[in-house]
Amino acid sequence: MMTNAKLTRPEFLETEADYENAPEGTIVACEDSPPWHKFGSEWSSVIAYGVQDDKGMSRAIRQVLRWGWGE
């Protein structure tokens, strides 16, 4: 697995691998969906009251609002 230092911040996440490789703390969103926040290996949304894995998240292309914890 890659470390945060080896990853560059993409503008969008599209594939299951994109979501899997996003570091914890990343926040993504798209026009018709609330923001999703990555904690560990899961993505959660307070507004959508849901949890998704990387495969579930890859059903939509989302814009990266924050990469990791923003460090």
Q: Which functions belong to the PLM regions below?
A:
Residues 1-71:
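Structural boundary micro-motifs
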